């Protein structure tokens, strides 16, 4: 699986996930800096108030 891993509005970058990792995620939240977006491999557990979208195809988490 390959997932995007750039932060917020940085130029697109992606990486290959470890063997057996078939999910990508996109987390989004707001703080004093504005809206923060984090992308990567897997499907992490998030705290309340953080939007999480997990998906299972190549580069699906932009």
Swiss-Prot record:
Belongs to the three-finger toxin family. Short-chain subfamily. Type I alpha-neurotoxin sub-subfamily. It comes from Laticauda crockeri. GO terms for cellular component: extracellular region. Binds to muscle nicotinic acetylcholine receptor (nAChR) and inhibit acetylcholine from binding to the receptor, thereby impairing neuromuscular transmission. This is Short neurotoxin C. Residues 1-16 have a biased composition (Polar residues). One of its GO terms (molecular function) is toxin activity. Keywords: Acetylcholine receptor inhibiting toxin, Disulfide bond, Ion channel impairing toxin, Neurotoxin, Postsynaptic neurotoxin, Secreted, Toxin. InterPro entries: Snake_3FTx, Snake_toxin-like_sf, Snake_toxin_con_site, Toxin_cobra-type. Gene3D superfamilies: CD59. Expressed by the venom gland. It holds the Pfam family Toxin_cobra-type. Residues 1-21 are annotated as: Disordered. Disulfide bonds join 3-24, 17-41, 43-54, 55-60. The lineage of its organism: Eukaryota, Metazoa, Chordata, Craniata, Vertebrata. It is found in: Secreted.
């Amino acid at each position: 699986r390959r997932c995007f891993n750039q932060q917020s509005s940085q130029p697109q970058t992606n990486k290959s996930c470890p063997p057996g990792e078939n999910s990508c995620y996109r987390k989004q939240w707001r703080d004093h800096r504005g809206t923060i977006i984090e992308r990567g491999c897997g499907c992490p557990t998030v705290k309340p108030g953080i939007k999480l979208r997990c998906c299972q195809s190549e580069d699906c988490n932009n």
